[in-house]
């Protein structure tokens, strides 16, 4: 019985190690911080940082407004009875905010292309195709 228990424990440990190591092979070994990604020249790094800072400055207020509208939308849905005209109005405002954010993202992408910065390049988590979700730091292109 002891021998069977030891074998089972060893097998479980080996399985856990094997499953844990597979993430190292995902995306060609490029991890969260995009190790082994094509390096940017110092000019490209400077341009990337400026483009990123400009995008953040322009989009942060819109993102905060979107979060506020999302809370308002959820509160309106929780009301008894829900006011469909108010809910639709807030949903339309959220749609307009998302569209404005998308337009800013397109402008950012164009600026990066004009600066010769390859898609997926950048500094830090999410500025590459590492399989995250969402925008602004989560790797969606």
Swiss-Prot record:
Induction of its expression: Expression is stimulated by Zn(2+) in a concentration-dependent manner. Expression is up-regulated in response to high periplasmic concentrations of Zn(2+) or Pb(2+) via the ZraS/ZraR two-component regulatory system. Transcription is also dependent on the RNA polymerase sigma-54 factor.
Database matches in Pfam families: Metal_resist
Result of knocking out the encoding gene: Deletion of the gene confers increased susceptibility to five classes of antibiotics and to some environmental stresses targeting the envelope. In the absence of stress, the mutants show no default in membrane integrity or in cell morphology as compared to the wild-type cells. In the presence of drugs that target the envelope, the mutants show enhanced membrane disruption and abnormal cell shape. Deletion does not affect the minimum inhibitory concentration (MIC) of E.coli for zinc or copper. In strain TOP10, disruption mutant exhibits a higher tolerance to zinc concentrations above 0.5 mM.
Source organism, top-level taxon: Bacteria
Signal peptide range: 1-26
Compartmental location: Periplasm
Regulation: Zinc binding is required for repressor activity and enhances chaperone activity.
Transmembrane annotation, as ranges: none
GO molecular function: cobalt ion binding; copper ion binding; identical protein binding; nickel cation binding; zinc ion binding
Annotated Gene Ontology cellular component terms: outer membrane-bounded periplasmic space
Keywords: Disulfide bond, Periplasm, Signal, Stress response, Zinc
GO process annotations (BP): cellular response to cell envelope stress
InterPro entries linked: Metal_resist (IPR025961)
UniProt cross-references to Gene3D superfamilies, sorted A to Z: 1.20.120.1490
Subunit and interaction comment: Homooctomer. Organized as a tetramer of dimers. Dimers are formed through a disulfide bridge, which stabilizes the oligomeric state. In vivo, the cysteine residue is at least partially reduced in the periplasm, i.e. it does not form a sulfide bridge with the cysteine residue from another monomer. Disulfide bridges might not be essential for the function of ZraP as a repressor of ZraS.
Anything else known: Expression of the P.mirabilis transcriptional regulator PMTR in E.coli results in increased production of ZraP and increased cell resistance to zinc. PMTR has no effect on resistance to nickel, cobalt, copper, manganese or iron.
The record's note on its domains: The N-terminal region contains the metal-binding site and the C-terminal region is involved in oligomerization. Contains two zinc-binding motifs. Binds four zinc or copper equivalents per octomer with high affinity and without change in quaternary structure.
Protein task: Part of the Zra signaling pathway, an envelope stress response (ESR) system composed of the periplasmic accessory protein ZraP, the histidine kinase ZraS and the transcriptional regulator ZraR. The ZraPSR system contributes to antibiotic resistance and is important for membrane integrity in the presence of membrane-targeting biocides. ZraP acts as a modulator which has both a regulatory and a chaperone function. The zinc-bound form of ZraP modulates the response of the ZraPSR system by inhibiting the expression of the zra genes, probably by interacting with ZraS.
Protein family per UniProt: Belongs to the ZraP family.
This protein's name: Signaling pathway modulator ZraP
Organism of origin: Escherichia coli (strain K12)
